[in-house]
Curated annotation (Swiss-Prot):
One of its GO terms (molecular function) is ATP binding. Gene3D superfamilies: 5' to 3' exonuclease, C-terminal subdomain, DNA helicase RuvA subunit, C-terminal domain, Nucleic acid-binding proteins. The gene is ruvA. It comes from Haemophilus influenzae (strain PittGG). Residues 156-204 are annotated as: Domain III. Has three domains with a flexible linker between the domains II and III and assumes an 'L' shape. Domain III is highly mobile and contacts RuvB. It is found in: Cytoplasm. GO terms for cellular component: cytoplasm; Holliday junction helicase complex; Holliday junction resolvase complex. The keyword Aminoacyl-tRNA synthetase does not apply. Disulfide bonds: none annotated. Residues 144-155 are annotated as: Flexible linker. This is Holliday junction branch migration complex subunit RuvA. The lineage of its organism: Bacteria, Pseudomonadati, Pseudomonadota, Gammaproteobacteria, Pasteurellales. Belongs to the RuvA family.
């Protein structure tokens, strides 16, 4: 089992990246909450990983924090929640936000995530409620780290919006819905990652 990778970031196209580890290129899928923490292309990064083995593919998922991977593993244990849906959940909410929604039994927030219907949300509440009692109450309200604008990242509004729409579709949103979400928040000065984050935040 591959549990951790450290290497040079070669490519990033939300939610996928290519990581060079001693000459071997690893393709990883990341939730957007981890994607936001990535450095610039060409820089080194370390990710905690989880390997999903299927008949048709081996999928490697990466996480900036071990707590993100822990929640991912708890989610895929839940009946009806596969890796793709777990990725969408972790992209829409931080671990703290998800824990707070579970402990407060906020079904409406959970059902706004693509692929999470009422029954799935109820199963998540039943199976995961109480598992976050060790999380400090103050941690529930930690805001996502602000990402400064970087001149080295493509900031042209059209390409940023297109990349953001593609990423949201990959996370399970319907094309028309993804386009509407992006149009609502897109600004010329925002990078694709910032557009995605604002779109996901507005959706909740």
């Amino acid at each position: 089992m591959i549990g951790r990778l450290q290497g040079i970031l070669l490519e990033k196209q939300p939610p996928e990246i290519l990581l060079n580890v001693q000459g071997v290129g690893y393709e990883l899928l990341l939730p957007m909450t981890s994607f936001y923490d990535l450095p610039e292309i060409g820089q080194e990064t370390t990710l905690f990983t989880h390997l999903v083995v299927r008949e048709d593919a081996h999928l490697l998922f990466g996480f900036a924090q071990k707590t993100d991977r822990t929640l991912f593993r708890e989610l895929i244990k839940t009946n009806g929640v596969g890796p793709k849906l777990a990725l969408a959940i972790l992209s829409a909410m931080s671990v703290e936000q998800f824990a707070y929604a579970i402990e407060r039994e906020e079904l409406s927030k959970l059902t706004k995530i693509p692929g999470v219907g009422k029954k799935t949300a109820e199963r998540l509440l039943v199976e995961l409620k109480g598992k976050f009692k060790g999380v400090k109450q103050s941690d529930f309200f930690v805001e996502s780290t602000h990402i400064p604008l970087s001149p080295s990242i493509e900031s042209h509004s059209e390409s940023s919006s297109d990349e953001a729409i593609s990423a949201l579709i990959a996370l399970g949103y319907k094309p028309a819905e993804a386009e509407k979400m992006v149009k609502r928040v897109a600004k010329p000065e925002l990078t694709s990652e910032q557009v995605i984050r604002e779109a996901l935040k507005a959706a909740l």
